[in-house]
Curated annotation (Swiss-Prot):
The gene is ABHD4. The keyword Lipid metabolism applies. Belongs to the peptidase S33 family. ABHD4/ABHD5 subfamily. It catalyses: N-hexadecanoyl-1,2-di-(9Z-octadecenoyl)-sn-glycero-3-phosphoethanolamine + H2O = N-hexadecanoyl-1-(9Z-octadecenoyl)-sn-glycero-3-phosphoethanolamine + (9Z)-octadecenoate + H(+); an N-acyl-1,2-diacyl-sn-glycero-3-phosphoethanolamine + H2O = N,1-diacyl-sn-glycero-3-phosphoethanolamine + a fatty acid + H(+); N-hexadecanoyl-1-(9Z-octadecenoyl)-sn-glycero-3-phosphoethanolamine + H2O = N-hexadecanoyl-sn-glycero-3-phosphoethanolamine + (9Z)-octadecenoate + H(+); N-octadecanoyl-1-(9Z-octadecenoyl)-sn-glycero-3-phosphoethanolamine + H2O = N-octadecanoyl-sn-glycero-3-phospho-ethanolamine + (9Z)-octadecenoate + H(+). The keyword Lipid metabolism applies. It holds the Pfam family Abhydrolase_1. One of its GO terms (molecular function) is lysophosphatidic acid acyltransferase activity. This is (Lyso)-N-acylphosphatidylethanolamine lipase.
């Protein structure tokens, strides 16, 4: 309906009044283009069609470097390909890098997901596998941040032959929810705000309900994003990108809500299943030293996989968005991992 009104204004009043929810896929496309134009390496951006007619928005950097195993990066909740802008050039100097908007997020298709946690998770994982098949990628170094780390782990359980190394960056949804709240790290203000509305609506519904004030809410609750990307942008480009990614139809957001018990916890915690990943799949877990995520998970994964390669490390001066808080250190660590593969 909103898109129709934008394309075909009905009279002078419609053209005079601002659109209640000032967003569209074309606006998301435009702000993403401003971000991607910062790339120095050759890149290709396009839709990859899946057999079920869904489409996955995909960015491939350095497509000509085919001799090494490609790195595939999976963003977290509410994110998209643009948030990897501090990493894509550095991590594609010696190998091809692929990143994509998860099904239901960013510019990818936004279908209706199953409402149960297992069904929603499986829908995500199946879309990643059919994307891989459509891309013709035989195997990959798979990196996932936050929700992307949870889904990358689930994918590795089901398709271990396709994963040369699993890199989990501040992964969401691993530990069981403690019975004692005092054992939980204090989350940042924006997480508390999201958690306060979870019982009534989708996590980011407030952005859509706020209408023309939505973009301002992103800037108010996440001013840190502007600082993280200040070397590339001195305006509100990143805040606009985050807003337009999350002011659309909340398809992936609804699926995420089905998978979570509360914002910080999964209904199907990954620690209960990570032992199912084949023993020969190496895992590296990267945390921000100041993250609100439980960093003891790495040690617990080691205990569950005594006969497998598991490395966990913390990056000083970084919080949950490690890749943006300390991009140079993060890029060096990931590049070292990739070089260990080939």
């Amino acid at each position: 309906m909103a898109d129709d009104l934008e394309q075909q204004p009905q009279g002078w009043l419609s053209s005079w009044l601002p659109t209640w929810r000032p967003t569209s896929m074309s606006q998301l496309k435009n702000v993403e283009a401003r971000i991607l134009q910062c790339l120095q390496n050759k890149f290709l951006a396009r839709y990859v069609s899946l057999p079920n007619q869904n489409k996955i928005w995909t960015v491939t950097v350095s497509p000509e470097l085919r001799d090494r195993t490609p790195l595939v990066m999976v963003h977290g909740f509410g994110g998209g390909v643009g948030l990897w802008i501090l990493n894509m050039d550095s991590l594609s100097t010696r190998r091809t890098l692929h990143t994509f908007d998860l099904l239901g997020f960013g510019r990818s298709s936004r279908p209706t997901f199953p409402r149960d946690p297992e069904g929603a998770e499986d829908e995500f994982v199946t879309s990643i596998e059919t994307w891989r098949e459509s891309m013709g990628i035989p195997s990959m170094i798979l990196l996932g941040h936050s929700l992307g780390g949870f889904l990358a782990t689930s994918y590795s359980i089901k398709y271990p032959d396709r994963v040369k190394h699993l890199i989990l960056v501040d992964p969401w949804g691993f530990p069981l929810r403690p019975a004692d709240p005092s054992q939980v790290r204090a989350p940042p203000t924006w997480v508390k705000a999201v958690a306060s509305v979870l019982g009534r609506s989708n996590p980011l519904a407030v952005l859509r309900v706020a209408g023309p004030w939505g973009p301002g809410l992103v800037q108010r609750f996440r001013p840190d994003f502007k600082r993280k990307f200040a070397d590339f942008f001195d305006d509100d480009t990143i805040s606009e990108y985050i807003y337009h990614c999350n002011a659309q139809n909340p398809s992936g957001e609804t699926a995420f809500k089905a998978m979570m018990e509360s914002f910080g916890w999964a209904r199907r915690p990954m620690l209960e299943r990570i032992h199912l990943i084949r023993k020969d799949v190496p895992i590296t877990m990267i945390y921000g030293a100041n993250t609100w995520i439980d960093t003891s998970t790495g040690k617990k994964v080691k205990l569950q996989r005594p006969d497998s390669y598991v490395r966990d490390l913390e990056i000083e001066g970084a919080s949950h968005h490690v890749y943006a808080d300390q991009p140079h250190i993060f890029n060096a660590v990931v590049e070292e991992i990739c070089d260990s593969v080939d």
